[in-house]
């Protein structure tokens, strides 16, 4: 049996895995439909880092494509940043065995980052920007219409609270994004999926996971704190994390305080006019009780 082959499952384990697989496919398909992520004829580039999230994303998209209502192509793209100890043969071997079209971009961003960032400081920010630029360039040069990333529900929530607590903004990671230069569409098909489900799926499927800390940099401590906070919430108040994520899909600008999103100055002119929609009027009746 190959080193990365999935171990055989017993009946109960197989039943549980099938439920997990169906849930991930359903949630991924729902996110794709809700946000119009993939259209007929798209060339979708799955950014494969070698981590559990991107492996799961690629695997789920390959299976969804079989019965998808639209035709689209998939290509896996990995960026070999020349980090010391990076096992350069792992992804090509796996993708070749699976018959998946792929391309490896070889670019020594590791040396660039190390020459700029002081020792002991996190390199993730600069590394991410360099990586994004290289992937965007590849997409532009090869007719890629959608760039698929493996961010999941927990990533989105962690980012939301990072921006809330440390940035003073109400924003997260959108499931679908137009790049600043308006040339690329980035999609996150796993937006509805829990990290724990993805981790379990990747473990059972025995993907050849590549460690994400080869560069020696540690994940941002603030993000680690957000992850721990969400985990604690879910432990003490089951369902709270899902409720917070649902809130990101039910925004009421009239109940916040951003005058760029809602014209508060115009409310005087609306007095004694026809009743507003629930979004604009919800909560206002409390003031008159």
From Swiss-Prot:
Its cofactor is Mg(2+); [4Fe-4S] cluster. A motif (PP-loop motif) lies at residues 49-54. Keywords: 4Fe-4S, ATP-binding, Cytoplasm, Iron, Iron-sulfur, Magnesium, Metal-binding, Nucleotide-binding, RNA-binding, Transferase, tRNA processing, tRNA-binding. One of its GO terms (biological process) is tRNA thio-modification. One of its GO terms (cellular component) is cytoplasm. Binds 1 [4Fe-4S] cluster per subunit. The cluster is chelated by three Cys residues, the fourth Fe has a free coordination site that may bind a sulfur atom transferred from the persulfide of IscS. Gene3D superfamilies: HUPs. It comes from the Bacteria. It is found in: Cytoplasm. It catalyses: cytidine(32) in tRNA + S-sulfanyl-L-cysteinyl-[cysteine desulfurase] + AH2 + ATP = 2-thiocytidine(32) in tRNA + L-cysteinyl-[cysteine desulfurase] + A + AMP + diphosphate + H(+). SUPFAM superfamilies: Adenine nucleotide alpha hydrolases-like. Pathway: tRNA modification. GO terms for molecular function: 4 iron, 4 sulfur cluster binding; ATP binding; magnesium ion binding; sulfurtransferase activity; tRNA binding. [4Fe-4S] cluster binds at residues 124, 127, 215. Its EC number is 2.8.1.-. Pfam families: ATP_bind_3. The thiolation reaction likely consists of two steps: a first activation step by ATP to form an adenylated intermediate of the target base of tRNA, and a second nucleophilic substitution step of the sulfur (S) atom supplied by the hydrosulfide attached to the Fe-S cluster. Homodimer. Catalyzes the ATP-dependent 2-thiolation of cytidine in position 32 of tRNA, to form 2-thiocytidine (s(2)C32). The sulfur atoms are provided by the cysteine/cysteine desulfurase (IscS) system. Belongs to the TtcA family. This is tRNA-cytidine(32) 2-sulfurtransferase. It comes from Methylococcus capsulatus (strain ATCC 33009 / NCIMB 11132 / Bath). The lineage of its organism: Bacteria, Pseudomonadati, Pseudomonadota, Gammaproteobacteria, Methylococcales.
């Amino acid at each position: 049996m190959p080193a990365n082959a999935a171990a055989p499952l017993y009946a109960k384990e197989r039943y549980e895995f099938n439920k997990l697989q169906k849930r991930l496919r359903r949630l991924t398909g729902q996110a794709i439909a809700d946000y119009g992520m993939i259209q007929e004829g798209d060339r979708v580039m799955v950014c494969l880092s070698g981590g559990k999230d991107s492996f799961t994303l690629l695997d789920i998209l390959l299976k969804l494509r079989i019965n998808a209502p639209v035709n689209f192509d998939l290509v896996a793209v990995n960026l070999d940043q020349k980090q010391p100890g990076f096992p350069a043969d792992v992804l090509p071997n796996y993708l070749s065995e699976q018959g998946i079209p792929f391309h490896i971009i070889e670019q020594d961003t590791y040396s660039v980052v190390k020459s700029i960032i002081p020792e002991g400081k996190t390199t993730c920010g600069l590394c991410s920007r360099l990586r994004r630029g290289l992937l965007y360039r590849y997409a532009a040069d090869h007719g890629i219409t959608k760039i698929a990333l493996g961010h999941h529900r927990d990533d989105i929530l962690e980012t939301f609270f990072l921006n809330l607590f440390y940035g003073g903004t109400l924003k997260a990671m959108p499931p679908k994004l137009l790049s600043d230069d308006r040339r690329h569409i980035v999609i996150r098909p796993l937006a509805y999926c829990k990290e724990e489900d993805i981790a379990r799926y990747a473990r059972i499927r025995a993907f050849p996971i590549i460690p994400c800390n080869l560069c020696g940099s540690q994940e941002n401590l603030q993000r680690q704190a957000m992850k721990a906070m969400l985990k604690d919430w879910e432990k003490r108040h089951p369902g709270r994390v899902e409720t917070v994520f649902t809130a990101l899909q039910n925004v009421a600008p009239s109940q916040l305080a951003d005058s760029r999103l809602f014209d508060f100055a115009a409310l005087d002119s609306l007095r004694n006019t026809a009743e507003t929609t629930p979004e604009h009027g919800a909560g206002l009746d409390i003031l008159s009780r």
